[in-house]
């Protein structure tokens, strides 16, 4: 299926070969990335967000339905959201400062919360699902063309949604208040 990748990868790796007799430097993994948890896809944002939560709030983990939010927030800097599907956590930053962290619920078996880089495409303070029996989706923030969105909802702390990222209601409201259309969303796990 991906046979076209093999020649390209071989050509790329050929350029990485060491010169005979050359001294190779020892390389170490970046300090900001933890390999302790088996991520399927990560650029290091989710593991770093967890470290930032511990440093900022002194919390190692949150129970289902729990969240933390900073008492002060910088007025400058881009807002971004980091979602960790592996640990069922959502983090929000402004610039380099972690504003908040929350437990969440993503897609249950048979459904998908997609990995990757996204942006907020639509925001509505109250919305009803067109796919799932007119289900309420308060503080809805859609990130793709198929209906995947952040919203307030039932948060058991494990994957239980049809693909959306369900958040505790108060956290969903706070998140809605600090984002705008185009806010970056990174989903890892």
Placement of each model-derived feature along the sequence:
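N-terminal pre-domains immediately preceding structured catalytic cores
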Residues: 2-138, 146-165, 169-189
